[in-house]
């Protein structure tokens, strides 16, 4: 990505905002962010209070998990994309925000997601991941379809029939983990390894202490949850045995991928720890955040959209002789648009962090602001992707927003740590699984509407991803 000009074209303003009293103000902001207001309202409130989309903030979790929580936030589409400029933004150890888990969580290595592009190791590791996906692209559709059939739809139908509804979120981990494991591990079934049936549980236990400082589980009284999870980092020892089982399983089963790493000059041990980070954070956590939003939006849209989707999907597949192929999926413009719209409204990773590599000027829609070298920065993707100066009805789910001439707006879809019109490469920080995530989103819709004409949902809001219950399933009649 080319560097942005450092010559401001708009009036220069001081960055508004106030960090307040040391520690006390940051803790108040943390309670507002997690409990009193919620993430979305908190960021919108800062922009409204200071009449600016570039503002100073105390970023949660703050004290005492981090000493560096005084950030500048980019809250519109114009300022947010500066976070993608690798000549300006250093991403070293900023993936999780203002705190970072110890290296022991990753076998003593730093996964590529924590490495800046200036590090020579970045291109080698990112290139390895991209080439691994490319070599397995023919497996994406058949393996995912099998996982959907074996670990999602059969259980959905059974639970709806017997219990009156099915917890969609609860069924996802086994389905997504099984797909990921078979994809990366030479089609080995995870239950045939040391993991048995507990693979998703070991993975969730390992992920929990890495993610919980920046989340709210909403299962405990706020003051207890805050005390336990937002004031210090959980030691690795609590999840060491879970992680070791994952390491053992992938080391023994992902033979081809690890052989490929060695041919590229990457140590087998380093490759397996990078693979586990890819599996856990990028794929497992990302997909389990994305799919509930997708099914929620489609479910709430109702029968009219369902009929349109079913007609498009079934027609495209019929034209392919009844086969669900990549060629057929690529013809489904409404399906594509629905997936893009979901990723626009609810990006799986809502926050992008980094530190300024040098002094530069950042522009919002109406002003320029000086960013000093070393300043810690955060971009809030849901506000950037719902910028009212870019999108009409920005907070509404518009299924066909990106159809026809609407495709021109794809450059403003920013969920992948890059523009939708750009591609991941060894020299950038864009999500290596960008195309795979979109394909799986389309494929789950294809499978839904090949089986069912319509369905209804019941939604329970959570901190970020909703809990989705499937209430009814009407089987396909044509």
Swiss-Prot record:
Coiled-coil annotated residue ranges, if any: none
Residues reported to bind heme: 431
Keywords: Heme, Iron, Lyase, Metal-binding
Catalytic activity: (9S)-hydroperoxy-(10E,12Z)-octadecadienoate = colneleate + H2O
MF (Gene Ontology): colneleate synthase activity; heme binding; iron ion binding; monooxygenase activity; oxidoreductase activity, acting on paired donors, with incorporation or reduction of molecular oxygen
EC assignment: 4.2.1.121
Role, per record: Involved in the biosynthesis of the anti-fungal toxins colneleic acid and colnelenic acid.
Family assignment from sequence similarity: Belongs to the cytochrome P450 family. 9-divinyl ether synthase subfamily.
Protein name listed in UniProt: 9-divinyl ether synthase
């Amino acid at each position: 990505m080319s560097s942005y000009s450092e010559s401001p074209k708009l009036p220069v303003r001081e960055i508004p905002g106030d960090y307040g009293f040391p520690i006390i103000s940051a803790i108040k902001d943390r309670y507002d962010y997690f409990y009193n207001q919620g993430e979305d309202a908190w960021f919108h409130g800062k922009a409204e209070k200071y009449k600016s989309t570039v503002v100073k903030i105390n970023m949660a979790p703050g004290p005492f998990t981090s000493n560096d929580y005084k950030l500048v936030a980019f809250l519109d589409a114009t300022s947010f994309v500066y976070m993608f400029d690798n000549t300006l933004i250093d991403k070293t150890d900023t993936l999780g925000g203002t705190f970072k888990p110890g290296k022991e969580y990753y076998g003593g290595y730093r996964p590529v997601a924590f490495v800046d592009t200036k590090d020579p190791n970045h291109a080698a590791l990112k290139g390895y991941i991209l080439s691994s996906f490319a070599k397995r692209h023919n497996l994406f559709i058949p393996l995912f379809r099998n996982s959907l059939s074996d670990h999602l739809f059969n259980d959905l139908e059974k639970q709806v029939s017997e219990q009156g509804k099915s917890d969609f979120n609860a069924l996802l981990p086994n389905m997504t983990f099984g797909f990921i494991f078979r994809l990366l591990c030479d089609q080995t079934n995870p239950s045939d390894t040391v993991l048995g049936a507990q693979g998703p549980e070991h993975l969730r236990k390992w992920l929990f202490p890495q993610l919980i400082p920046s989340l709210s589980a909403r299962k405990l009284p706020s003051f207890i949850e805050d005390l336990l999870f937002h004031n210090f980092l959980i030691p690795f020892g609590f999840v060491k045995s879970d992680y070791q089982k994952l390491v053992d399983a992938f080391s023994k089963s992902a033979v081809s991928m690890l052989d490929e790493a060695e041919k590229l000059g990457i140590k087998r041990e380093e490759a397996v720890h990078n693979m586990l980070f890819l599996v856990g954070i990028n794929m497992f956590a990302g997909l389990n955040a994305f799919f509930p939003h997708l099914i929620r939006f489609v479910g709430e849209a109702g029968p009219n959209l369902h009929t349109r989707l079913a007609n498009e999907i079934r027609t495209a597949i019929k034209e392919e002789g009844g086969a669900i192929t990549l060629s057929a999926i690529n013809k489904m413009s409404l399906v594509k648009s629905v997936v893009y719209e979901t990723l626009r409204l609810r990006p799986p990773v809502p926050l992008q962090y980094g530190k300024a590599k040098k002094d530069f000027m950042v522009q919002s829609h109406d002003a320029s602001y000086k960013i000093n070298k070393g300043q810690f920065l955060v971009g809030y993707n849901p506000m950037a992707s719902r910028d009212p100066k870019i999108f009409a009805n920005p907070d509404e789910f518009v299924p066909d927003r990106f159809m026809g001439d609407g495709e021109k707006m794809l450059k403003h879809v920013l969920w992948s740590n890059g523009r939708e019109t750009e591609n991941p490469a060894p020299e950038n920080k864009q999500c290596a699984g960008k195309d795979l995530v979109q394909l799986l989103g389309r494929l789950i819709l294809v499978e839904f509407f090949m089986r069912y004409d319509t369905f209804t949902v019941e939604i329970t809001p959570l901190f970020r991803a909703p809990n989705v219950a499937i209430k009814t399933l009407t089987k396909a009649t044509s």
